[in-house]
Amino acid sequence: MPGALSGRRMLPSGLCLGRWQLLRTIRARGRGDPRELPSTPQVLCMKLYGNPKYHQALHYGTVEPQDEITVTYKHGLPLVTLTLPSRKERCQFVVKPMLSTVGSFLQDLQNEDKGIKTAAIITADGSEIPASTLMDTLLMTDFKLIINKLRYDIRCHKKEEPSGEHMTELENTKSLVHRLFTILHLEEIQKRRERHLMAKIDHLQEQLRPLEQVKAAIEARSEANTSGLLWAGLALLSVQGGALAWLTWWVYSWDIMEPVTFFLSFANSIVFFAYFIITRQNYTYSSLRSRQFLQFFHKKSQRRCFDVEQYNKLKEDLAEATESLESVRRSLRLRIQGEEASEKN
């Protein structure tokens, strides 16, 4: 082999030329023996040496990884392609940007693959995106999709910013479509909203029920303490009046006790004025009673771990939902009355 390889010349492209592969090879001219080159054409045969895989490794494919989530557009609609965790199959979801929301998209994922226990969408900086956000708004920027505690970075294609006239026309079209949809499906929308409000009211009442029980117990104790304090004040004033009468008629004379009663009345006026400066409220028995009741209530709430802010928030939400439900039912009644009147005519 070394002798055979010594007669071969390596070509730049990794090809090796063998002496046995030449047809009628031409020898170099010897000393004093010049020969002319033959006129017949020469055929050069080449043989490939080396590892062919080395050259094939330079070619790279464009196949996407199986676990990558991509967003593409087809016929103007976004296509979200991902791998289902249970079946390990690639699945495409067609997104309607103006109708689909983040919540409906996540629900579609869970309906398609029951192995998806948790799914959420967050922004690139980690802020959670509400379920009511439209997919059109979501696809404007990059975001992250969390499926069963696995995070996937999704990069969205940048869309060309439309002109001002196009945006105005698009907004007008959206408004027109929304009005037409509302007019054609008004009764269905109102009934759906009524069911939603009733479910919300039931949920709020369910949350308020244990809080109401704790609040009633705290109010009863606070009321008892406030009443006891008022009775103690009445007893103190009675003792003061009895002491002044005893000193006036049995111990001293009125001439001596008159200045004492005057300064006592003046001291009471100072106390009332100080109460106004501190509390910014007039000194009345009703305001004093309410203030003392609230003090007892908040102290006992802290001891019982009763969240007053949460209770007030739930009560406000319940009042708002009840008012909205009454408004929806009023609209439904007016609509039914109008239909009945038109049928009679």
Curated annotation (Swiss-Prot):
The keyword Coiled coil applies. GO terms for cellular component: calcium channel complex; membrane; mitochondrial inner membrane; mitochondrion; uniplex complex. GO terms for biological process: mitochondrial calcium ion homeostasis; mitochondrial calcium ion transmembrane transport; negative regulation of calcium import into the mitochondrion; positive regulation of skeletal muscle satellite cell differentiation; regulation of macrophage activation; skeletal muscle tissue regeneration. It holds the Pfam family MCU. It is a multi-pass membrane protein. InterPro entries: MCU_C, MCU_fam. Residues 1-44 form a transit peptide. It comes from the Eukaryota. Residues 188-221, 306-334 form a coiled coil. Negative regulator of the mitochondrial calcium uniporter (MCU), a channel that mediates calcium uptake into the mitochondrial matrix. MCUB is required to limit mitochondrial calcium overload during stress. Acts as a dominant-negative regulator that displaces MCU from the functional uniplex complex and thereby decreases the association of calcium sensors MICU1 and MICU2, preventing channel gating. Mitochondrial calcium homeostasis plays key roles in mitochondrial metabolism. Belongs to the MCU (TC 1.A.77) family. Homooligomer. Associates with the uniplex complex, composed of MCU, MICU1, MICU2 and EMRE/SMDT1, inhibiting its activity. This is Calcium uniporter regulatory subunit MCUb, mitochondrial. It comes from Mus musculus (Mouse).
